[in-house]
Amino acid sequence: LGSIEFNLKDIEKPAQLTLEVLIDNYANNWNFWVYPTEKEIVNSNDILLTDYLDKTAIKRLNNGGKVLLSLKKGTLKDEYGGNLAIGFSSIFWNTSWTNGQAPHTLGILCNPKHPALAPFPTEYHSNYQWWDAMTHSAPIRINKVSKEAQPIVRVIDDWFSNHPLALLFEVKIGKGKLLVSGIDFHRDMQMRPAARQLLSSLLNYMQSSDFSPRHIVKIETINDLIDK
């Protein structure tokens, strides 16, 4: 049928592109995402990336610093959402008829204009750039952490349980600022370009004045999420 070649080197910013093929009166199109090659992501002096609020992270928060808590896949306790099977695809038929067959969720909702997602092109719903994040994550029952905090990225729960679930949210701990991620940003990152771009987007956000959590929670509440 032929081939298509396109040089991506001139694309300097993250972008969602559309390839459309037209033959006579028939057309089809496909979305794909291009992310510039990033240098290895390392913790800046201003932000600590961790999977648990240990003494170093707690000291950072108490001194007014910034911490990105990224939960490792499989470490979220069941009572906080660890028993919910998140899926990129939605529930098949319904979980009552399938005896709780996975997945237990119905995609995500987010504000595409939220500054945390600025260098991560997205619609308000999940698309294929979210596949990696959702397959390396757990949905957090945010109402058990804070009654006031709102998700940056919301996971839609099964309509039978309808728990408020978050993939990303932010809170204030003492003088410090904490971004909590149900997405695992630790494992196999060299093989996950979409995850690297999303992490870069979050770190850029945390380094900006837009990152200003208002709702206060206790350190013990956050650490209770994790099954160590």
Predicted features, each with a name:
Residues 26, 53, 163-165:
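Residues that act as N-cap/strand-start positions at coil-to-secondary-structure junctions
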Residues 12-25:
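Short, aromatic- and glycine-rich surface loops/edge beta-strands on solvent-exposed regions
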Residues 38-42, 207-215:
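Short, charged low-complexity linker/loop segments at the C-terminal edge of domains
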Residues 14, 76-77, 94-193, 211-228:
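Catalytic beta-strand/loop cores that center a nucleophilic Ser/Cys/Thr
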Residues 1-14:
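Intrinsically disordered, low-complexity Pro/Gly/Ser/Thr-rich segments with frequent PxxP/GP/PP motifs
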Residues 26-38:
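Edge beta-strands of extracellular beta-sandwich domains
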Residues 44-94, 172-177, 181, 202:
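Short alpha-beta junction capping motif
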Residues 194-207:
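Short amphipathic C-terminal alpha-helix that caps PH/PH-like domains
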